[in-house]
Amino acid sequence: MAPFGRNLLKTRHKNRSPTKDMDSEEKEIVVWVCQEEKLVCGLTKRTTSADVIQALLEEHEATFGEKRFLLGKPSDYCIIEKWRGSERVLPPLTRILKLWKAWGDEQPNMQFVLVKADAFLPVPLWRTAEAKLVQNTEKLWELSPANYMKTLPPDKQKRIVRKTFRKLAKIKQDTVSHDRDNMETLVHLIISQDHTIHQQVKRMKELDLEIEKCEAKFHLDRVENDGENYVQDAYLMPSFSEVEQNLDLQYEENQTLEDLSESDGIEQLEERLKYYRILIDKLSAEIEKEVKSVCIDINEDAEGEAASELESSNLESVKCDLEKSMKAGLKIHSHLSGIQKEIKYSDSLLQMKAKEYELLAKEFNSLHISNKDGCQLKENRAKESEVPSSNGEIPPFTQRVFSNYTNDTDSDTGISSNHSQDSETTVGDVVLLST
């Protein structure tokens, strides 16, 4: 680990990076080492690429110990800057944090890779003009880019680094200026459109004023020439067809005078008189029509008001009629409901009476059959007991039968009387309900 002031460079695997808890000035970068991403923390504005190389080698030695495979001194290694297929060797004194910030939006496309200086390409892809003019005694194909940069003097190395920074700054300025130009063009376009819209609105207002002036001038000219009522006079003036008719009439009158001068027939004069009378009637009818049309235009407002009053009165009368009809309908509906209830009640009473009638008929039939049997028994027993009957005495058995028969008849009459009373009461109830 290499100390720089109060900060220390620390390296670790990127996927095992803990939560960041460092000062505002500390930064970090990612460096690829043997196909692994190493996170270098604690960078400051004075940290160079050589410091980063030394920190990476020390961390590798601490983790692997004797099994390490990055052998050699820090001067034997270099950091390569890769961007979109292009590569460049960073000099040892390159300020790594400044370079990283200079990339700006292109940082995701840029990578730092740690390689051995001897394993890199013999000729660098990015070379400055000063580097091309250098006449080195050593053979170029025997030197790697890192060794080649090391052979250059420190002044030229600084120039190369400055030139790369200038190029990066220029690229950044070009992108910013392009975006700024696009925004400026949009702003200018909006301002120009707003200006044209204001001009068009102003022109429309001027045209409206000119039209109003022309109409006022035309109105004054007509008033001076034809008077204030020139509109009404224009509608009441005879049309071109009427003028032609008048000319035709004059022409016909001239012809009639000539005919009269030629022939003094009385019949022709009578025909002409009839014709003139017909014409006079037509003209009078047309005049009356025109007068009526003018009067109609004048009286339209009064008629409209009268019609509105009549409509309002008609509406009120219709509303009153509707209310009356609604009340009458409600009364009729209530009366109908009462009648329906009475009908249902009378139907139920009739059904009950029909059932009672059936029961009484069955009882009557049964009693009639029992009476017939009793009469036959009486006859048979009378024949057997002719002797005691001749004495005028009634046997006790016959007295019992007779008493039973009388009781039965009395009971029958009692039942019928009860039913008759029920029927009378029910009839009285029905009559009261109907009233």
Swiss-Prot record:
Is Coiled coil found in the keyword set? yes
Q: What does this protein do?
A: May play a role in regulating vesicuar trafficking in cells.
Q: Where in the cell is it found?
A: Endosome
Q: What is this protein called?
A: Ras association domain-containing protein 9
Organism field: Homo sapiens (Human)
Major location, coarse class?
other
**Residues covered by the Ras-associating domain:** 25-119
Task: Name the source's superkingdom.
Answer: Eukaryota
Coiled coil listed as a keyword: yes
Source organism phylogeny? Eukaryota, Metazoa, Chordata, Craniata, Vertebrata
